[in-house]
A protein has these predicted regions:
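Conserved short strand/loop->alpha-helix "switch" segment adjacent to the catalytic nucleotide/phosphoryl-transfer site
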Residues: 18, 33-68, 72-82
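Short beta-to-alpha transition helix within the HATPase_c
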Residues: 1-5, 9, 16-34
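Short beta-strand/loop element within the Bergerat-fold HATPase_c
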Residues: 80-92
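ATP phosphate-binding glycine-rich loop and adjacent ATP-lid/helix-beta elements
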Residues: 107-133
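A short coil/beta-turn micro-motif at the C-terminal edge
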Residues: 89-91, 136-139, 149-151
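C-terminal end segment of the histidine kinase catalytic
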Residues: 145-158
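Acidic ATP/Mg2+-coordinating residue in the GHKL
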Residues: 100
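Glycine-rich nucleotide-binding loop
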Residues: 82, 104, 136-144
């Protein structure tokens, strides 16, 4: 599970910080496989998350696993496709895009499901950020997260 993956990474590190790129590569593969029992889904990670603290790692892994799962289950809806996660890190700022090449959002789609509410709460609370769902011009959806990382994690990068 996502939580077990983060805990495993933290167990090898006494300072409670973890290279999230290593953690997330496992989470990304697991989420896509579990969500897509029928279609072939390729997953791509672009950019780098860098080192984050334990609390950030747990919240970020949970949010991203949910977003990748939703992209596969709802965006791709059983067909073959691609989910790309792009991370852009600048000291204590993190921008993440979770993009799929699926059907995209209908113009009147309300993002009110339980998973969406949990993700939004984690992004606003734990990650001190904002999240938006945007349609991609060629089809698909781009979920964009802007987060502020804890200073301790940002200093670990320096």
């Amino acid at each position: 599970t996502t939580i077990a993956t983060v805990h495993d990474a933290l167990s090898h590190n006494v300072n409670e910080r973890v290279d999230f790129d290593d953690v997330f590569s496992s989470v990304l593969r697991m989420a896509a496989v579990v969500a897509s029992p029928t279609g072939q889904v390729s997953t791509v990670l672009e950019g780098s998350f860098g080192v984050v603290d334990a609390d950030t790692a747990q919240a970020l892994a949970t949010v991203l696993a949910e977003l990748v799962t939703n992209a596969v289950e709802h965006g791709l809806d059983g067909r073959d496709g691609r989910v790309t996660v792009k991370a852009c890190r600048d000291e204590d700022r993190l921008e993440v895009h979770v993009m799929d090449d699926g059907a995209g959002l209908a113009p009147d789609t309300l993002m009110t499901g339980l998973g969406t509410r949990i993700v939004t709460t984690l992004v606003r609370g734990e990650l001190r950020g904002v999240i938006d769902w945007e349609p991609l011009s060629g089809g698909g959806t781009d979920v964009v997260i802007h987060a502020r990382l804890h200073q301790r994690a940002a200093r670990a990068e320096a």
